[in-house]
């Protein structure tokens, strides 16, 4: 087993949807109980699989086969994946979490989850245009929270089978993975992955 530190940097605003909304926000980002955003491991693993599958198809399986890819990602197998991945958090997450936890307890009500989240995110507003009039369509105002460009997420990737082929597949998939989250075709979600 080999452990690696994985770093994902948001090169543009990034929406990692939580699937939740409220009266103020139509589309919220995933965040912990203190308001710090994170990159869910399951979502990243799915993106890596799609990225690697794209490479296998483009190279006509010259780089690696689809069977090798499915084995590494544990698809159709009882053994599970050939690597484990944890959620990616902000650098020094434990220290930040402990600090926010202390402030939440010491000054209850003064430091809210929303205030913490606001320091890492921004809210984007958009409307749909009415094609006939060229103006905003009635009732089309929509907003979504975006993680700020420049935000870095780090976490641990553990390669279970210590073989060069598996490592190469992951390295290529990470290099090929350039977009995540919503609004990718609107200039959002551009990321850089470093192992």
Predicted regions: what they are:
Residues 1-126, 133-195:
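RNA-binding basic/glycine-rich loop and surface signature characteristic of RAMP-family CRISPR effectors
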């Amino acid at each position: 087993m080999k452990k690696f530190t994985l770093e994902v940097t948001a090169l543009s605003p990034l929406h990692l949807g939580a699937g939740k909304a409220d009266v103020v926000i139509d589309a919220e980002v995933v965040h912990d109980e203190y308001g710090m955003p994170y990159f869910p491991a399951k979502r990243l693993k799915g993106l890596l699989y799609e990225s690697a599958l794209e490479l296998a198809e483009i190279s006509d399986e010259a780089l690696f086969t689809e069977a090798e890819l499915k084995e590494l990602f544990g698809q159709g197998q009882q053994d599970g994946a050939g690597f484990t991945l944890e959620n990616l958090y902000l650098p020094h997450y434990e220290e930040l979490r402990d600090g926010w936890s202390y402030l939440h307890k010491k000054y209850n009500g003064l430091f809210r989850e929303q205030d913490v989240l606001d320091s890492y995110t921004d809210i984007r507003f958009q409307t749909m245009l009415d094609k006939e009039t060229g103006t905003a369509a009635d009732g089309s105002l929509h907003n979504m929270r975006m993680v700020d460009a420049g935000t870095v997420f780090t976490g641990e990737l553990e390669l279970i089978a210590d073989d060069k082929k598996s490592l190469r597949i992951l390295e290529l998939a990470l290099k090929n993975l350039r977009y995540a989250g919503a609004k990718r075709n609107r200039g959002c979600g551009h990321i850089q992955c470093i192992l």
